[in-house]
């Protein structure tokens, strides 16, 4: 399995690779170049899931943000944890990945990316989302998936 090592020398799991890709894109890197770079690291058997999670999270980014906000008691100021939540929620709400696998792998990804102290938060929020799934389908369905500045401008016009 070809996965990239991180600081401790262990390999990153698929969800951690997805989070790293999403963070790179959010920081202004080209999706095509980041995808090509990471596709070479991800194992052959995981490439389809990797591709689906990256593109799906990007497609649903603003909707996932709207789903996440009510689950938090205070806003997150940590892009790694926030992105882990989006990856986990996307799996739970938009794919057929088993809930226990989505949660476990996403929590492990947060640990692998240096967020061990906040991995409990990721776990708690994703578990809560599995209990309250129906209300989040409504949020996803009604979300515009447009950046707030663009949605406001379109409403104005």
Predicted regions and their residues:
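Class I Rossmann-like S-adenosyl-L-methionine
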Residues: 1-157
């Amino acid at each position: 399995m070809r996965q990239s090592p991180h600081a401790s020398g262990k390999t990153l799991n698929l969800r951690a690779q997805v989070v790293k890709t999403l963070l790179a894109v959010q920081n202004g890197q080209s999706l095509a170049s980041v995808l090509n770079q990471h596709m070479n690291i991800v194992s052959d058997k995981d490439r389809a899931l990797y591709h689906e999670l990256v593109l799906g999270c990007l497609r649903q980014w603003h909707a996932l943000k709207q789903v996440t906000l009510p689950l938090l008691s205070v806003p997150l100021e940590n892009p790694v944890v926030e992105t882990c939540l989006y990856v986990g929620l996307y799996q739970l709400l938009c794919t057929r990945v088993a809930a226990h696998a989505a949660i476990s792998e996403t929590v492990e990804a947060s640990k692998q990316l240096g967020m061990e102290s906040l991995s409990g938060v990721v776990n708690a929020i994703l578990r809560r989302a599995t209990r309250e799934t129906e209300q989040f389908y409504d949020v996803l369905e009604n979300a515009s998936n447009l950046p707030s500045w663009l949605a406001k401008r379109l409403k104005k016009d």
